[in-house]
Amino acid sequence: MKITDAKVFVGGPGKNYVTVKVMTDSGVYGLGDATLNNRETLPAKYLTDYLVPNLIGMDPRRSEDIWQFLYRGAYFRRGPVAMAAFGAIDMALWDIKGKLADMPLYQLFGGKSRDGAMVYGHATGADLEDLMDSIAHYVEQGYKAVRVQCGIPGMPTASYAVPEERGASKHYISDFSGIRPKTEIWDSGKYLRWMPGALMAIRERFGPDLHILHDVHHRLTPREAAQFAKAVEPVDLYWLEDPTPAEDQAALRLVRQHSTTPIAIGEVFNSIWECNKLIEEELIDFIRVAATYAGGITHVKRIVDLAGLHHVRTGFHGAPSHSPLCMAAHAHLNAWAPNFGIQEYLVLGTPDCDALFPSDHRMEDGMVHVSDAPGLGVDFDEAEAARYEYRPGSHPVVRLTDGTMWDY
């Protein structure tokens, strides 16, 4: 059995999804996701010019050897561009493997560890009352867990994942108005003084059973993060996400020394070598890698296995910067992983997205139920794909009140 060709598609409804289709001489094909948010042409070019020509003639069943070929053969490897490209190919090879075996991927991993995977939605508000309404909306839909983000009084602009006006939704589609990003203003002092009280108000309103998550998006210094994590201990957060810049992993040791608030990190990590020390030293409670950015299913399974040895649970990234193909890979990993924690879930099921990526994965009552179809359980409609062209886009950048560049 040989790989005969592979195609790369860029485009989609509201996002420039990068989709890889690997074809074989048996007629079986596999699909993978290489979407790198607002940098989509980079993995697409890497795939088209370098990786796809090398795949031709290889045996798609040898997914481990191909992964090693892609990774070790690159020499200048790791990083989001390379790992997204490797990840898409690996995902497609697993899809082929499942179709050949006539099994859903979770069966190839070792079978189900659970019947459904708990997900969390994104509740946002321009102010606290607006946020409360958003949380109530998710609770009414059956969600057991909600990430909460809120506008900060006195902050000059809306911040990460917060709408500009009350009652508005925070759109996660790309801003296609041009390459130059918009600027948001951040003030850590205002955040640290106000947010702990807001989180406690949410806990008091919705009671002890709702899982509350909160994302700092890498914006605090180590001392500030330790202070904040300690201050919110009475809230009993399910997790505090990305409290410090991802590059400064020693910062999490300081946070850990001062607080028992669970810590989640990893959506920007591209390999096991960026998180192995955090896991082995048990400085985190949840690992947030994605099958796209972290080199595909093969590599993410290694991370999950290592995490399980150290009581670290999964909480895979699930923003709309991943296509339904990546989310399907996560659904299968979540069904299998004995150390599953929770799955980020933003509804992608618009009519346009469903037409482009037909699937029978289900979400109900705050749980994702994995498809039993062979492989990933998601298809790709090339005729629908022809409707979409690449559009340059951007997401905001962040500056402090004095103009200093800061982490988005």
Swiss-Prot record:
Molecular-function GO term, any one: mannonate dehydratase activity
Binding site for Mg(2+): D215, E241, E267
InterPro entries cross-referenced by the UniProt entry: D-mannonate_dehydratase-like, D-mannonate_dehydratase_GalD, DgoD-like, Enolase-like_C_sf, Enolase-like_N, Enolase_C-like, Mandel_Rmase/mucon_lact_enz_CS, Mandelate_racemase_C
Keyword terms: Magnesium, Metal-binding
Domain of life: Bacteria
Binding site for D-arabinonate: H217, E267, R288, H317, E344
Record's keyword annotation contains Lipid metabolism: no
GO BP terms in the entry: amino acid catabolic process; carbohydrate catabolic process
Function: Has no detectable activity with D-mannonate and with a panel of 70 other acid sugars (in vitro), in spite of the conservation of the residues that are expected to be important for catalytic activity and cofactor binding. May have evolved a divergent function.
Membership in a protein family: Belongs to the mandelate racemase/muconate lactonizing enzyme family. GalD subfamily.
Protein name in the entry: D-galactonate dehydratase family member OG2516_05608
Taxonomic classification: Bacteria, Pseudomonadati, Pseudomonadota, Alphaproteobacteria, Rhodobacterales
